[in-house]
Amino acid sequence: MKHWNLKRVLSLLLVVCMVTGLLSGVSAMAEDQTANYHEISTDGLKLATEDNAAADETETEEAPYADTDVVRVFVVLEDKPVLQQGYATRGIAGNAAAMAASKALEAKQAALAAEISANVLSGETLNVHWNLTLAANAMSVDLPYGKMDEVEALKGVKSVMLVPQYSIDPREQADLNTISSGNMIGSYNAWLEGYTGAGSRIAIVDTGLDSDHPSFNSAAFDYSLLVTSTKNGKQIADYNLLTAAKINEVLPQLHAAERYEGLTGNALYVSSKIAFGFNYIDATLDITHDNDQQGDHGTHVAGIATANRYVENADGTYTYADNGVVGVAPDAQVVVMKVFGKNGGAYADDYIAAIEDAIVLDCDSVNLSLGSAAVGFTTSGEAYFDNVMDSLDETDTVVCMSAGNSGN
């Protein structure tokens, strides 16, 4: 229990860092390693949750569609999702009762999909994108706009709403304050106490990763782990690293496997540093920025969290990253979940599917640094997504989502 609490403290440090967009790393540990803390008043702030939606949110009319237009919708079922049935996220893939509960929800979703196909779509097969059961009990499906009310009237259906889709805002530029952030969040002190993220798994749900970037070099990561384990009197095996074999063990529970036929743990495992990579928006293994126009924001965020503290030299030796970035948890593994790609911006159901996979993979922290400063409004689909995110507050996985990326 003590070990888990310490890991959770490190995860919370990551939350502080990522949601403020302050830290992409430091050149080296500053001479003054005393942490300075600044209290920030939250007086007058309110969260735009379902509970205060009437007071603080503006509900807009859904986009005008013709009845025959096919749209992507959430079909939310009445039963509670698995995590709201009292199951912990930690080790959930090995929890037989939790997995049985998930299968039971999937069975009801399958029966409902068959009913929709037969009675609403006149025998046409319903196209299902995701069957969500852990954080949400919902199917995301393609449906004629004019059929939404008919589906919502079916027994066992709680609600039907459009799935929000998000896009990268090209007006926003990286504006990171990195000089004093290490002191502000106390990462230097955490490192001095031995908390470097070793044994942690951090999921980045974003635009992907530059997998060839030296900040994520596996040899340098392995060297750093050796240094850390030796200093702490441990073996690298003590850190329970995510491996291809461990991914294979939970593969049947991963949404990624539903979208990619013949998927294996070896294909998802990139390296000891980049322990997992999947493209949820395009249903491919391409997690890079090379083949789309969605930008390299994901690499920036992954660097904030996990950039290595050593770089590999040409002669095979290693040097501290004096002239590069060092993440808050440099010894943590990064789990890359690309939700922006060739098919454009992510849908909210892609986010949830990625989060559920991160939970199955036993990630300690899940980051969605996807907020925008652009003025917007809340639709019913966005309110539902917010509610799903809020429900994760009570789990033992730290899930954080930024309110914006333009704070200064």
Named regions from a protein language model:
Residues D212-P214, C363-N408:
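Catalytic-core segments of hydrolase enzymes
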Residues E31-P170:
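Inhibitory N-terminal propeptides of secreted protease zymogens
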Residues L14-L22:
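Hydrophobic core
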Residues G86-A88, A153, L162, P170-D175, ...:
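Short, solvent-exposed loop/turn and secondary-structure capping segments
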Residues E31-D32, T68, N189-F278, D282-Y347, ...:
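Subtilisin-like serine protease catalytic core
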Residues V76-K80, L143-P144, V163-Q165, I204-G208, ...:
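Active-site-proximal beta-strand/loop segments in catalytic clefts of secreted hydrolases
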Residues K2-L13:
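Bacterial N-terminal signal peptides that target proteins for export
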Residues V26-M29:
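Sec/Tat signal peptide C-region and signal peptidase I cleavage site
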